[in-house]
């Protein structure tokens, strides 16, 4: 965790355009709070400004939002925020760095959540080798939290064919028993299952795990970057799009930060304008479009009770910056293209639930 906390400033400090045209339901003040942990703020209102000072604060905000959702009897939940600074992308950085950061953050969120409500959390890994690796590397972290247990998607009862391939994998990976193997087995039924570090192919196994073990128990998808994984659904070798319609659509984002970098060409110097923004949500507050300021903070420019599409997020940022083309013009069409939303944002009528939009 020390590595992640030490590197936090890079996540919220890259250059951006500062604008005075901030329009939002909440009003920012010059000396206002820079995170939502203040006890004086109404959680149902959006934050005017967001800039957590550390990953500890970020985890606290995530745990607070999760606690509100659990108290409202929400059982299918999502938390998604950058586990490492934006200067380290998932392509440039080591995958182990992201895996380890997510484990540390998940444990921290559980610890913070237990300060709010009684929780017996089970962290579910993609497979037994990942579970075993975590038990070896994070033994002290798991021991520091009461009632925490760990499991894997391999715990799902399999067919004879599935069991055969699991035995092959175990042999090839030298998947031998470890002395810590049974240390964090659940002694009582968990009250919350947390799924971390899973890929697109493993989403269908999460669905089976939930059906088998968590049909009436809250389940949390933690930092899976679902928008990235959804893009693979329907492609050859991946689960079908129906997985989103029937399963992923049930998960309500309770704490969500998706940062993006944009650029806009203009006819005058400097000819290219760069700006950064984020789609932001803290349950039970509204969805918010945030514009990055020169001091690294994110200021609210628009909010809605329902989720903004990625295209709408960009349009809100362009509008507040005064860079939006004239509506209906040919230039607007050429810049936006024929479609400005993804298939999972468009196919409302096929969804079993609208929770993921709320």
From Swiss-Prot:
The keyword Magnesium does not apply. Its main location: plastid. One of its GO terms (cellular component) is mitochondrion. Keywords: Acetylation, Chloroplast, Plastid, Transit peptide. The modification N-acetylglycine is found at residue 25. The gene is LPA3. It comes from the Eukaryota. Residues 1-24 form a transit peptide. InterPro entries: DUF1995 (IPR018962), LPA3 (IPR044687). This is Protein LPA3. Coiled coil: none annotated. The keyword Plastid applies. It is found in: Plastid, Chloroplast. PANTHER family: PROTEIN LOW PSII ACCUMULATION 3, CHLOROPLASTIC, PROTEIN LPA3.
